[in-house]
Swiss-Prot record:
InterPro entries: Restrct_endonuc-II-like, tRNA_endonuc-like_dom_sf, UPF0102_YraN-like. Pfam families: UPF0102. Residues 1-23 are annotated as: Disordered. This is UPF0102 protein azo0871. Belongs to the UPF0102 family. GO terms for molecular function: nucleic acid binding. Disulfide bonds: none annotated.
Length: 137
């Protein structure tokens, strides 16, 4: 089944998705629920720009948090944390700058951090939330 990328970017529910995309969406839902239970208010999900994307954007107290969600069913090849490369960090930072210049403009005065939520193993395994996992420097 082909993915309707435009519908997916616009957040239209029910957009055709591959099994991998559906699994990714489920993982992001798990991550968002975990963060919400820890007091994070989710402001945005799945925002795309040329050169990058944001899985989740939230407020944790007064801190603006850009969250990368990484899933791995199997710990081979280093697990979910090992998949956060320098290039991936660069793309998340680029997308955060884009978001702050547009949709998130009203939050541009807030301090920011880059977090990662790791989902490893079966769906019953609790997520691991790495706060301040990397910097924009």
């Amino acid at each position: 089944m082909k993915t309707d990328r435009k519908a997916e970017r616009s957040g239209i529910v029910g957009a055709a998705a591959s099994p991998m995309q559906a699994r990714g969406r489920e993982g992001e839902e798990r991550a968002a629920a975990h963060l919400a239970a820890q007091g994070v208010r989710i402001l945005a999900r799945n925002r795309h720009c040329r050169g990058g994307e944001l899985d989740l954007v939230g407020l944790h107290g007064d801190m603006l948090v850009f969250v990368e969600v990484r899933m791995r069913a199997n710990p081979r090849f280093g697990g979910a944390a090992a998949s956060i490369t320098a290039e991936k960090r660069r793309r998340v930072i680029l997308a955060a700058q884009w978001w702050l210049a547009g949709e998130g403009r009203r939050h541009a005065h807030r301090p920011c951090r880059f977090d990662v939520v790791l989902l490893e193993g079966p769906a019953t395994t609790p997520p691991t939330w790495l706060q301040a996992a990397f910097d924009a420097d």
